[in-house]
Regions:
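ATP-binding Walker
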Residues: 55-56
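Short beta-strand-centered aromatic/proline hotspots
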Residues: 639-646
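N-terminal pre-P-loop "Q-motif" helix
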Residues: 28-43
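Short, well-ordered loop/turn sites that connect or cap secondary structure elements
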Residues: 595-597, 628, 634
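Helicase motor core with emphasis on the C-terminal RecA-like subdomain
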Residues: 6-11, 15-21, 42-48, 60-158, ...
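Short, basic/aromatic beta-hairpin or loop at an interaction surface
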Residues: 598-619
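Short, solvent-exposed secondary-structure boundary/capping segments
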Residues: 647-664
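Extended, highly charged accessory segments
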Residues: 529-532, 536-600, 664, 672-914
């Protein structure tokens, strides 16, 4: 591993005079990271460059290739056309985001133009190094133009590279010498990464010699594994910046007591004192410590916006914390030039954008004497939300940026943000990766970020430039979120990020890439197997699994009534050859890539109950709907609803006030807290709790009655006084209620009676949904076997909730949750195939494996049609013992969705009492 060192005076002597002159005009000197990267790249070695955002990685990757292209173009400019190098792409840049690719293409124009001008000024020919971009937004005419006249540098995405390799456009790639993969960390741990790894090996098969691979990554663990992902069978040198990013991260709570939020005063809307006037405290029951089932469910529901956000909750006179958060955010936006506000869901992104615009309009309206009682008008969708209402004042302070915003609007927001013309953007992870946003001087995060790695990326958007200090604040919405925010902040300061694990032997991705490769060439099965095994995610692929995929694609499971199992390729076993069938190439490009269609069901009232037809209550994840039946009681927001009907795309509900209900989940927003982060969370709670109850706290009392060591730790983590106070009071309240704090070493089982007289058994655990979901499955299986009823288990990041009917027998407790590790593994493996998760993931895997034909290239069938067809396929597939996509679906559930390794280790610790 090469560590960045101090720059040397001769770092640029390896480049031409023109490149050196341009660089020194643009920058004071190379960064240590750039110099180390150039040492490796100059020698032709593969390189993985790891550094925080804004450290000059991209220019480090491109500059050698640009210099070589410029010299070659200048040297051959006077030669006859037939003696010049042939047309073709020389540098291939792959980005996980189209926006990032477009940003890189824009940023390349300055060095290309500047270096070319210097060469011309020195008396040489004006070299022209051309760039081009191919993504899903590229029109057919543009694609044909790229094929006729390929650029020297092509910017693309993993999916578009696959499409090029599966068409005649691949001929333009036979000249590639350098492949740059940006944001490697965002790809390596997913099926998208496995797909790209196979595409890179297919690309190498086209070339006379393997291309030099350069990977760019934010801070990542483990480095060697990511390097192996990048290089496949080839060695990769890791160049890493060992210094921690320069950050100033704060955790801010805008009220003194989050369980007794003062009513937000309507007249105090300006300046930092916003919200201090108004009525006295009014207790918010859902924010109390975890004293009951209702309180825990409220705490576990912290990832969703309060139900009344679109009505009284975010309005004047409310005792919600939201008006205080909104006012604090607006104060920060007005105090800075440009601000990004990150949130964790698209719905919250839209709502917060609308509220900031609304609040800004009201502040300006008061200043200008605008009639604030004028009729409200919807915010225009290009400026904010279509889901909320705002006064007629123009919404000029904030715009939304997320995956559902149109391409044109996203580009407009990015341009305005980069130019410093837009004061605020509210975004999801769509702006998390390395788009150059050097004008951003503040990042705010509402609720804790999904992980420490994500937090580093998001806060790193501020001052995204060499030497810039990133400044950001996290606004928890509940007391329990303060814990997650503090853990994220501490993890950022200490560089403790979560590990990335490669997705291994994904058979659905293998099936898609096999059809694509065979569509272009007749292949020897053994040669294709060797190509596949060169890719790191498939380096341990068993030949038996490989052959099972070939058998499936060759029609082994074809039946008269299921065309989806009909053969995609021909496998000539006698000759060991793989051949295309008519239409193979079309099938390969119709459903390219790995990003799944994830579906949501609208939740509506019956017709006639709403003022204007069916009134929308919310939406549910399709996996939640698969688990639901007519008559079930569910919670949306703070209300309970009884399901009266489930249609192909809607759930029709009726109010069920006062009824005990299941809490919904949404897998589309992420898989939940990593177990590693949960362990950090538990250790943090254990340390803080010890500082409250120990002798040290009494002897050396710091702020809020905690030990000096804990007080100093919380302050170093960036918690303001109110954040510290609320965190300490949460821990005290929990100890008063149960006598013990759940942490990484101590899991707490709590029992209480619910509203209907049944018992709730709750397991408090920090280890996250990926651990808790399979654990809850095993517990449900045990309860059914012993007691004969369904416990209606619900798992979330903070634990498991069971519903136990009131009986005369002894109420079960901790014995429900303790398992032999191997027994638990067996139960989960046996039961996973009957879960809603399995059904939903089977549909996605079947689509990736090209078993569900779309309507047309790039167009998906309606989700209800996909679900119907997938159900038929699943029923047929279950009759085959080792159907590859059943095997893959089980692998995805057990390895990618569930964290069975962490659960197994946890059960071993429970057994050992450690």
């Amino acid at each position: 591993m090469d560590e960045a060192r101090e720059p040397t005076p001769h770092a640029l002597t390896r480049f031409s005079d023109e490149v050196r002159g341009w660089f020194l005009d643009a920058f004071p000197e190379p960064t240590p990271l750039q110099e180390c990267a150039w040492d490796v790249i100059e020698g032709g070695e593969n390189a993985l460059v790891i550094a925080p955002t804004g450290s000059g990685k991209t220019l480090a990757a491109f500059l050698f290739a640009i210099d070589e292209l410029m010299r070659e173009k200048a040297a051959t400019a006077g030669l006859p056309k037939k003696e010049r190098p042939g047309k073709g792409v020389r540098v291939l840049y792959i980005s996980p985001l189209k926006a990032l690719g477009a940003d890189v293409e824009r940023n390349l124009q300055a060095p290309l133009a500047g270096i070319a001008a210097r060469m011309a000024a020195a008396g040489g020919a004006m070299p022209e190094v051309r760039t081009g971009m191919r993504t899903g937004d590229t029109t057919p005419d543009q694609r044909r133009s790229l094929q006729r006249n390929p650029p020297d540098i092509l910017i693309t995405t993993p999916e578009s590279l696959y499409l090029m390799l599966t068409s005649q456009a691949r001929e333009t790639l036979r000249t590639v010498e350098t492949v740059i993969v940006d944001e490697v960390h965002a790809l390596a741990g997913s099926k998208r990464g496995a797909h790209l790894a196979l595409s890179l090996e297919r690309l190498d098969d086209l070339l006379e010699k393997p291309a030099q691979r350069i990977g760019l990554s934010a801070t990542v663990r483990p480095r060697d594994e990511i390097a192996r992902f990048l290089g496949g069978p080839h060695p990769v040198r890791v160049v890493a910046s060992e210094g921690r990013p320069d950050m100033d991260v704060r955790v801010r709570v805008p009220v003194r007591d989050m369980t007794a939020v003062p009513t937000f005063g309507g007249s105090d809307l300006t300046g930092g004192a916003a919200g201090k006037r108004g009525g006295g405290p009014r207790r918010a029951p859902a924010e109390e410590a975890w004293k009951s089932d209702r309180a825990l469910r409220a705490a576990m529901a912290k990832s969703s916006l309060p139900a009344s956000t679109t009505s009284p909750d975010s309005r004047l006179g409310s005792s919600s914390i939201w008006p205080y958060i909104e006012a604090s955010i607006l104060d920060e936006v007005l105090a800075h030039r440009t601000t990004i506000v990150f949130v964790n869901s698209r719905g919250l992104c839209e709502k917060l954008t609308a509220r900031l615009n609304d609040l800004y309009a009201k502040r300006m309206g008061i200043a200008r004497g605008v009639d604030m009682d004028a009729p409200a008008a919807p915010i225009r969708s290009d400026l904010g939300s279509t889901a909320d209402m705002s006064t007629g004042a123009p919404a000029v302070i904030a715009k939304a940026h997320h995956g559902s915003v149109s391409k044109e609007k996203r580009l407009q927001v990015e341009r305005e943000l980069k130019a410093g013309e837009l004061p605020c953007v509210v975004a999801t992870s769509s702006l998390e990766l390395g788009i150059d946003m050097g004008s951003i001087d503040l990042v705010l995060q509402v609720a804790a970020p999904p992980s420490v790695a994500s937090a580093l990326q998001r806060i790193g958007r501020a001052n995204h430039q060499v030497g810039g200090r990133s400044t950001g604040s996290i606004f928890p919405r509940t007391r329990t979120e303060i814990i997650d925010a503090a853990v994220a902040a501490e993890g950022m300061y200490e560089g403790r990020i979560e590990q990335t694990a490669l997705v291994k032997n994904a058979l659905d991705v293998l099936a898609q890439q096999t059809v694509a490769a065979v569509a272009m060439d007749e292949l020897a099965a053994d040669d294709w197997f060797d190509t596949v095994r060169r890719a790191a995610p498939y380096s341990e692929l068993p030949r038996r699994a490989f052959d099972s995929v070939l058998s499936m694609l060759a029609g082994r499971y074809a039946t008269a009534d299921l065309a989806e199992f009909s053969p995609r390729i021909v496998w000539d076993r006698e000759r060991g050859r793989l051949l295309a069938r008519p239409g193979t190439q079309r099938q390969a490009v119709m459903s390219a890539g790995t990003i799944p269609d994830r579906g949501m069901f609208s939740v509506v009232l019956p017709e006639g109950d709403g003022a204007q037809g069916r009134r929308r209550v919310g939406e549910l994840d399709e996996e939640m709907v698969y688990e639901s039946r007519v008559g079930d009681i569910i919670t949306l927001g703070t209300s309970s609803w009884r399901i009266s009907e489930i249609t192909r795309d809607r759930v029709i509900v009726e109010p069920a006030p006062g009824r005990s209900a299941r809490l919904p989940f949404w897998h589309g927003e992420g898989v939940g807290r990593p177990a590693e982060t949960g362990r950090m969370r538990g250790a943090f709670l254990r340390a803080v709790a010890a500082g409250i109850e120990g002798d040290d706290a009494e002897a050396e009392e710091g702020g809020f009655g905690v030990s000096c060591a804990v007080s100093e730790r919380l302050a170093a983590d960036g918690l303001d006084d109110d954040a510290q106070r609320n965190l300490v009071e949460l821990i005290r309240s929990q100890r008063a209620a149960t006598g013990i704090i759940p942490d990484d070493k101590t899991l707490v089982v709590e029992r209480c009676e619910d509203e209907q007289g049944d018992w709730r058994v709750l397991l408090h655990s920090p280890y996250g949904r990926r651990v808790h979901e399979p654990w809850a499955m095993a517990v449900s299986d045990r309860i059914m076997a012993i007691y004969g009823y369904d416990a209606q288990a619900m798992a979330a990041d903070d634990g498991i909730v069971l519903r136990i009917p009131m009986t005369e027998t002894r109420l079960p407790g901790i014995e429900l949750f303790a398992f032999d590790p191997d027994e638990l593994d067996r139960i989960v493996r046996d039961r996973v195939g009957s879960t809603s998760l399995f059904s939903a993931r089977f549909r996605e895997c079947a689509a990736r494996a090209l078993l569900m034909s779309p309507i047309a290239p790039g167009k998906r069938a309606p989700l209800w049609q996909q679900r119907l067809k997938a159900g038929q396929l699943l029923e047929a597939a279950r009759r085959e013992r080792e159907f590859p996509i059943l095997v893959e679906t089980a692998r995805e559930c057990l390895q990618d969705v569930y964290d069975m390794r962490a659960l197994h280790e946890l059960m071993e610790q429970v057994q050992a009492g450690s």
